[in-house]
A protein has these predicted regions:
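N-terminal cap/lid segment of alpha/beta-hydrolase-fold proteins
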Residues: 1-27
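Active-site glycine-rich loops that stabilize anionic/oxyanionic intermediates
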Residues: 34-42, 115-116
Length: 254
C-alpha cells in the first residue's frame, strides 16, 4: 500500500501557496527520497502512477506544481504565468524549498526533471547541486544560444504591444515547430502522439484543462532564458563534478 499526502508551502514569490504532494510506503519507512520536477503545461499528479510505483519499492516521492501550473495556480487565468521579475530563480528556489522540507541527513536524495522540468533541474544543479545523491535529466535538449536569444527578443517585441500576460498563437507555433510537426499535437491521432505511445494517457492529457492551457509571453520568455542559461559552458561547470547524472533522452533522439 502507498500513502499520498498533499500539502502547501510559500513560494519564493512571497504570495503564492505552492501545491505539493508526497507518496510513501504505508509503514512510513523509506530508504531514499525522489523529487520530481514536472514539465510545461502539466501538473505533478500526472506522475502519480510512477510515484506510487517508486513508493511501493521503498522510496518517498515528492513533487510540486510549479507556479502557473496545476493546483498552485488559483484560477485558470493564472495558468501559464510564473511570476513577475526573475521567475527562473523563483522556480528553482521553490524546488529547493521542497527539498529542504523533504531531505533528511541519513537518506539519499535524488531529483528528476522532465522536459521543461529538466531545464529547471539543470539550472537548479548549477546553484543548489551540492548534497544530492544523483539526478535524472529526462527529455531535455541542447539549443544554440542564437535560437534562445531570438525567441526572447520576439517575446519582448510582442509584449511591447500586447503585454507580458498575452497568450501568443505565434509563439506557440514557433515553440512547437520543427520536429514536432511529424507528430499528433492535439490528440486527434493519439497513436502518433509526441507525448507517449500509451493512447489512454494521450486521451487523458487532451481532456484535462490543466494540460491544455496556453503559455503567456512571460512564461515563454522565462523558459527560453533558462534554456539559454543551462547551455552556457560556464553554468554547466557550476554543477558538482562528482554528482551522478543520468541523461534519459526521448526515443527518437540521438
Amino acid at each position: 500500500m502507498v500513502v499520498k499526502q498533499e500539502f502547501t508551502f510559500l513560494s519564493g514569490d512571497g504570495k503564492t501557496d505552492v501545491h505539493a504532494a508526497r507518496w510513501l510506503p504505508d509503514n512510513g519507512d523509506y530508504r531514499a527520497v525522489f523529487q520530481i520536477s514536472h514539465g510545461m503545461i502539466e501538473f505533478i499528479e500526472r506522475y502519480e502512477l510512477f510515484a506510487a510505483f517508486l513508493a511501493d519499492k521503498g522510496y518517498m516521492v515528492v513533487g510540486h506544481d510549479h507556479l502557473g501550473h496545476g493546483k498552485t495556480a488559483k484560477t485558470p487565468e493564472d495558468w501559464g504565468y510564473f511570476a513577475d521579475g526573475e521567475s527562473p530563480e523563483i522556480l528553482i528556489g521553490d524546488m529547493n524549498k521542497l527539498r529542504t522540507l523533504s531531505q533528511e541527513p541519513d537518506k539519499p536524495y535524488f531529483m528528476l526533471g522532465h522536459s521543461m522540468g529538466s531545464y529547471l533541474l539543470r539550472r537548479y544543479l548549477s546553484v543548489y547541486g551540492g548534497g544530492l545523491s544523483g539526478a535524472v535529466i529526462m527529455g531535455t535538449g541542447a539549443n544554440p544560444d542564437a535560437v534562445a536569444k531570438l525567441g526572447m527578443a520576439v517575446c519582448k517585441a510582442i509584449a511591447a504591444f500586447k503585454g507580458w500576460k498575452y497568450r501568443s498563437p505565434f509563439m506557440e507555433k514557433l515553440f512547437f515547430s520543427g520536429d514536432f510537426q511529424k507528430f499528433d499535437m492535439d490528440g486527434t491521432h493519439p497513436e502518433n502522439s509526441w507525448l507517449t505511445k500509451d493512447t489512454e494517457i494521450v486521451r487523458f492529457y487532451y481532456s484535462e484543462p490543466r494540460c491544455t492551457f496556453k503559455f503567456t509571453l512571460k512564461a515563454y520568455y522565462d523558459f527560453l532564458k533558462t534554456v539559454y542559461y543551462v547551455n552556457r559552458k560556464e553554468n554547466v561547470e557550476k554543477i558538482p563534478k562528482d554528482l551522478p547524472i543520468l541523461i534519459a533522452p526521448r526515443s527518437e533522439e540521438r
